[in-house]
A protein has these predicted regions:
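Generic alpha-helical secondary structure
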Residues: 43-51, 163-174, 297-305
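Beta-rich nucleic-acid/ligand-interaction surfaces
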Residues: 64-93, 184-210, 321-327
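Short secondary-structure junctions
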Residues: 58-63, 179-187, 309-320
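A carboxyl-terminal module marker
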Residues: 191-327
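A conserved active-site cap/scaffold subdomain adjacent to cofactor or substrate pockets
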Residues: 126, 146-179, 228-262
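Class II aminoacyl-tRNA synthetase-like tRNA-binding/catalytic domains
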Residues: 2-145, 157, 212-240
Length: 327
């Protein structure tokens, strides 16, 4: 039976209190994100329906369910997960910094930094030789898209004396996941991928409505990450995966991520189980607007995207550069 683990942070509490007293643009943007609901907990939310479906699959029924802070350190988000110092995700144009060392977490994979340093979890690993967890949550997305997305990460660590984890184990878990969501007859393929915290990494694509669609990324836990958490890679091994709310959008035919956040009863009443299908509501048709402007060629476009969101807020699903001309 699954066990809920909530990891709280006094440091996060203090940072949020300090943030509430600030009125600068950066602080207002961060507060806007923190005020958004976590849809993995909201009834009639496609994201919660997806998560509930997953935790009831045979492999995941006994996994720990982990909740951890939304404001974390760069060490917890990047360093411990083997992220290079020059990785784009570390830039202030891609990540919300509260100060030099504290950020809004950018991915749920950062739960490793809390779960793998939890005393009771480590005691269980030593005693039983295996630990496993799922961590759902709301994370900050890149600044050109809707301001938040939901991600679900899975992690299994075990002693090699108990079993050696291979890429086949990784594929088996992903196939079970895909079949559990899309049905037993789903067609899939694997593509080699790369993540700083895993090796032998894979992207899984499924055939859906005549098109190949990426559904998740996964890999074997990187030995350096195990070392970073004080676990000897000669003794321990494991696998990990992660996917986002796009899975719910694909499965339920949701064309616009803003629909996932709606409280309109005409929308929320449509989502009852994993096989629910979205039907168009006239209030939410997608429209496109082109804007032309002259800017300094050295400007970072993420800053412009942020300004658009400051004014339009959740009316905007995505801002992107279509073309550029330099004279």
């Amino acid at each position: 039976m699954s066990r809920k683990i909530t990891i709280k942070s006094d440091e996060e509490k203090s940072l949020i209190e300090a943030l509430s007293k600030r009125q600068d643009v950066k602080a207002e943007r961060i507060k806007r994100f923190l005020a958004l609901p976590d849809l993995t907990k909201k009834e009639n939310s496609p994201v919660k329906i997806l998560f509930d479906q997953i935790i009831n699959l045979p492999t995941f029924r006994d996994f720990d369910l982990v909740e951890f802070p939304k404001i974390i350190t760069t060490e917890e988000c990047f360093d411990l997960l083997n992220t290079p110092n020059d990785h784009p995700a570390r830039k202030e144009t891609d990540t919300y910094y509260l100060d030099d060392t504290h950020i809004l977490r950018t991915h749920t994979t950062a739960f490793w930094s809390f779960y793998l340093r939890d005393k009771k979890v480590l005691e269980k690993l030593e005693k039983e030789g295996e630990i496993a967890a799922l961590a759902p949550g709301k994370d900050e997305i890149d600044r050109s898209h809707y301001p938040a997305f939901h991600q679900i990460d899975g992690l299994l660590i075990c002693k090699k004396s108990k079993r050696i984890i291979t890429q086949k184990d990784l594929k088996d878990v992903q196939v079970e996941l895909a079949k559990g969501i899309f049905g037993p007859d789903i067609e899939w393929k694997f593509i080699t991928d790369n993540f700083p915290y895993t090796f032998d990494s894979l992207e899984m694509d499924i055939m859906f409505n005549g098109n190949w669609m990426e559904v998740n990324g996964a890999g074997l836990v990187h030995p350096q990450c195990l070392k970073n958490f004080g676990l000897n890679p000669e003794i321990y091994n494991g696998w990990a995966f992660g996917f986002g709310d796009r899975l719910a959008m694909i499965k339920m035919g949701i064309p616009d991520i803003r629909i996932m956040w709606s409280n309109d009863p005409r929308i929320t009443s449509q989502f009852k189980d994993i096989n629910s299908k979205y039907k168009e509501v006239s209030k939410y048709p997608g429209t496109y607007r082109d804007i032309s402007f002259i800017i300094d060629k050295n400007i970072n476009l993420n800053n412009y995207y942020e300004i658009v969101r400051d004014f339009a807020d959740d009316l905007i699903e995505e801002v992107k550069l279509l073309d550029e001309y330099e004279n």
